[in-house]
Amino acid sequence: MGKVNKTDREWQRELSPEEYRITRQKGTEPAFTGQYWNTKQHGTYVCRCCGAELFSSDAKYDSGCGWPSFFRPLNGSVIDEHEDLTHGMVRTEIVCHDCEAHLGHVFEDGPQPTGLRYCVNSASLQLKTQEKNDEGTYP
């Protein structure tokens, strides 16, 4: 896809106020309130800002934290990591590689096979649902 460069004004026109606050101003939605924290639908989670494919529903799990959680991204090049020292903590922020939208944080307390928990704001995501094929399975 390539890098996406837009002005703040362009992002404000394209996103809801909540999406803008979270993705462009590094906000966080309250736990257990986002659209995808408890969804079980199959598909691909894409960046709300630029549409880059980020996570598969196959890697989503219930971490109990109140935000959508994944144990791995679709591939290692879709997400960038930055040190986050805000709120008196040391955390690892995750952002979309293509547009630098704030997604959430990654923690080292996830399940196997990675041991990682990508904790993502629903407002940073959009789910492209997937239907079962003729055999009754997901492609």
Swiss-Prot record:
One of its GO terms (biological process) is protein repair. It catalyses: L-methionyl-[protein] + [thioredoxin]-disulfide + H2O = L-methionyl-(R)-S-oxide-[protein] + [thioredoxin]-dithiol. Pfam families: SelR. It comes from the Bacteria. Keywords: Metal-binding, Oxidoreductase, Zinc. The keyword Metal-binding applies. Zn(2+) binds at residues 47, 50, 96, 99. Its EC number is 1.8.4.12. Its cofactor is Zn(2+). The active site is at residue 119. PROSITE patterns: MSRB. InterPro entries: Met_Sox_Rdtase_MsrB, Met_Sox_Rdtase_MsrB_dom, Mss4-like_sf. The keyword Metal-binding applies. Residues 8-130 form the MsrB domain. This is Peptide methionine sulfoxide reductase MsrB. It comes from Acinetobacter baumannii (strain SDF).
